[in-house]
Design a protein with these regions (language model features):
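Acidic, low-complexity, intrinsically disordered interaction modules
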Residues: 18-68
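Residue-level marker of intrinsically disordered, low-complexity segments enriched
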Residues: 13-14, 32, 46, 74-77, ...
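Compositionally biased, intrinsically disordered low-complexity segments
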Residues: 8-10, 19, 37, 50-51, ...
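Amphipathic alpha-helical segments
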Residues: 1-15
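Ampiphathic alpha-helical segments that act as solvent-exposed interaction surfaces
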Residues: 6, 59-86
Length: 86
């Protein structure tokens, strides 16, 4: 998935400095809270060939890398939690 998808869906970018993380470089990720669930992306320093993935903060077992599926999931969660559907 491309980074632009997360921006379009309203994910918030969080920058983590090298000083904060102890990594040699700054990096960032995106997050989206819907109801009591949080979707997180892979970290920018883990991206291979521009392909990002998304997962639930609450579960390491869930990993999504298909744009259409993510769009559907976000839409369904917004409906379920009665949040405006974009």
């Amino acid at each position: 998935m491309k980074e632009e998808v997360f921006i379009e869906l309203g994910f918030e970018k969080t920058i983590v400095t090298a000083e904060e993380s102890g990594s040699p470089d700054d990096w960032y990720y995106y997050s989206l809270d819907i109801g009591n669930l949080s979707l997180l992306t892979s970290a920018s320093d883990e991206i291979v060939d521009g392909n990002w993935y998304c997962y639930f903060a609450e579960s390491d077992d869930f990993k999504m890398d298909n744009e259409a599926d993510l769009r559907d999931l976000v839409r369904i969660l917004r409906i379920a939690f009665k949040i405006d559907v974009r």
